[in-house]
Amino acid sequence: FSTQQQREDNGREKIVDLRLDEISDFPNHPFHVSMDNEMERLVESIKQNGVLVPALVRPKESGGYEMIAGHRRKFASGLAGREEIPCIVRTLSDDESTIIMVDSNMQRENLLPSEKAFAFKMKLEAMKRQGMRTDLTSCQVGQKLNGKTSREILAEEVGESQGQVRRYI
């Protein structure tokens, strides 16, 4: 028999240290990881303090993990001489992974227009697929979206006009 506390602990996400070589990049990741001044500062920070915010990964059916959020931290960890990175392991669908990956990177400054365009397109397609799936919603899609299209919701979420989102895509 398990106690209530044990059942609650089993349901919680845990932070685990994973080897960098166990984690593959997100397929078609639209954001470039480059060696710039910000990366140099991140490498130095990781050398001094370790990785302060865990990455988010999902398990792959073939073994290992797929990076959802934390590509720059993983790259910087390697440059800092680390072999592991703290990660939250979460089971996510392809669409959930895409939406989280895009959202976690949109807060970055200095995004290239090409990165925004590809990211907006990926997220919009994932949102549209989720809108078609009845198992992901407890109400009719029209009610869930409050009469708005996926493109309108995307524009609101990223702080751009609908016209600007349309131009990017």
Segments predicted by a language model, with ranges:
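Short, charged/polar connector segments at secondary-structure boundaries
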Residues: 1-90, 96-110
